[in-house]
């Protein structure tokens, strides 16, 4: 796996690439600056997103996990910039419980790029993995 650190308004982040796909975005720095076209593209897109000039990421990403994890991450990627859904909205669309959706959101391996921050509880913001 290749890794590269990037500093954003969200803090220090580490991108992890495996087999030409981003597979993780971790909070904090790893101290690594591996070379990779996918990491180059992901860093450029995160920088543009951070600057407010990008609204959707198109670098190749792969979510590791079961069918529910993959379905929830796909649903999160489909939420347009500037919009939000509730855990219940996604749960109804997938035919699962809101709690299961919340747990899958909490296990999002690529936060920011897979926008779990666009998913809220029925009464507003709940349980973030980042510094919110």
Indicate where each model-derived feature is located.
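…primarily DNA-binding HTH/wHTH and HhH modules…
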Residues: 123-132
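Basic nucleic-acid-binding alpha-helical/helix-turn surface characteristic of O6-alkylguanine DNA
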Residues: 1-96
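Acidic, glycine-rich catalytic loops of TOPRIM or P-loop NTPase phosphate-binding modules used
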Residues: 109
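Residue-level detection of the helix-turn-helix DNA-binding "recognition helix"
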Residues: 106
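Short Lys/Arg-enriched helix C-cap and helix-to-coil transition segments
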Residues: 112-121
